[in-house]
Amino acid sequence: MNTIKIAGVPEHFNLPWHLAIESGDFEKENIDLQWTDVPEGTGKMCQLLRDGETDIAVILTEGIVKDITAGNPSKIIQVYVESPLIWGIHVAANSKYNTLTDLKGTTAAISRLGSGSQLMAYVNADNQSRLHSGWKTDDLQFEIVNTIDGAVQALKNGTADYFMWERFMTKPLVDQGIFRRIGDCPTPWPCFVIAVRKEVLEKQADVISKILSIINQTTVDFKNIPSIDTTLALKYHQKIEDIQEWLSLTHWSQNQLKAEMLNKIQNQLIQLKIIDKKGTFEDLVETV
């Protein structure tokens, strides 16, 4: 049995992995795929890849691109979710802030340095700077909160003013009157990719190829699974109508990241001063 460790966020995007593991699809191919939930998100998963504590990460595109250019010994082997991630911009329910304009000069709660929540705060500030003078990405301030529970506390205590997280996963907190959503910020690129440590690719490329084949078949069929909306709503504590909207907006991919898209992502990260140099397509991407 080939043991492979994989990490991802405990969110609805990753249910196809759990279904494939539970149904024994990997086991039939002599693969023991060991899943670890990482609620801290992309910054933490980058560290797990660097430390050799996971072999594969299902990870935010912008985060892993940034970290590979900074020396993470991993490669992107495929896009996992083609559609953008819709980041909700949230404040405490009783906050004095009502519009995105009000957030200029305030503090963003982020899970970790280098996380999607930090990188997208730069994207949002850049978007706002085009609409309103006075917004500058250099003025952004951050409070590290690790998880969504940490963000709840930070916004409640006033140590941070707003928090960006996937809109639908955060919706229950809005429904409960804990957060109030004042805007959205979709990623300008496919949201999730599959990244693998180079050492694993060199030694077990055939196993990684089998894993891709299995998950791709699962995601192709995923939306056609009977009552999948009910399954998702129950598992992730969502309203059925929210899950149905999310399903209509979400498109899984079975294709490799294209060079033009990688170039677009890196150009924007350079413009935002998140990276200072671009990697080549070969530096970042490998097809198995």
Please give the residue ranges for each predicted region.
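Residues within well-ordered alpha helices
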Residues: 25, 66, 124, 172, ...
